[in-house]
Amino acid sequence: MRKILVIGAGAMGAAFTFPLVDNNHKVTLTEPYNKDFQNKLLKKNKFHPTLKLKLSKRVSIKKFSSELLDEKWDLIVVAVSSIGIEMVRQYLKNIKKKISILVLTKGLKYDQINKKIITMSEQLNKGNQNLNVSVLKGPCLAKELANKIKSYTVIANQNINIAKNIGKLISTKYYKTEYSSDVKGVEFSSAIKNIYSMIIGSGEGENTASALFRKSLDEMEYLIKYFRGKKETVHGLAGVGDLYVSAVGGRNSKMGEYLGKGYTFKIA
């Protein structure tokens, strides 16, 4: 049994508690960005409105605070939106002891100081060398994970053994993990696929969408190589895997469909 904190009580953060509980870990869920939402979870007996089901009785829901972060955790999972990553960083930078962090958040940010695009793990790592940050990406819809439908993701860390150790903590019969040392490739693939899923969704029909899917992979390879990732990572779970699930059933694909029909971005 390990003591694991999940930061972010949205759909993915909440869904991620299921494999953790099934591995008999002591799991705490906290919401730093939307405290009203966390209160509603408690009032409704842990019923999650997005997942449409109750969280396990074994999941403890606590108020987000510096004191909570200062407790001894075997793993901290960051599952906030990309907007909330800076807020979490401000708290994590004060942690004095070595701690393993697993980032579920997908996205990129422009670093105004260094004038370059950085990943969520790079943003989170600023100012604290005690954080050992791994990232988890791949084709995993929160509702399917919560309903224990077989899902596969990839954990990336420059030290592949650290990624494998985290995988042992979270893997179940329905939730499988692969491993990669290409952190850049995994994070950039997972982030830019959102753009391409919109492009694919804008296609007039299946023929067009299929062609756009193929062309999207070509461009993703080029971009991943440009950002110093490995282009073969594009053909893994964080690339083609995540692109597929987003293009078939994701919100970005639906957005692309409306844009393709002529709606403005605001209306779509």
Q: What label would you give each PLM region?
A:
Residues 1-55, 59-63, 121:
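NAD(P)+-binding Rossmann beta1-loop-alpha1 motif at the extreme N-terminus of oxidoreductases
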Residues 58-66, 70-148, 166:
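Rossmann-like NAD(P)(H) cofactor-binding subdomain of soluble oxidoreductases
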Residues 91, 126-132, 150-233:
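Internal alpha-helical scaffold of NAD(P)-dependent oxidoreductase catalytic cores
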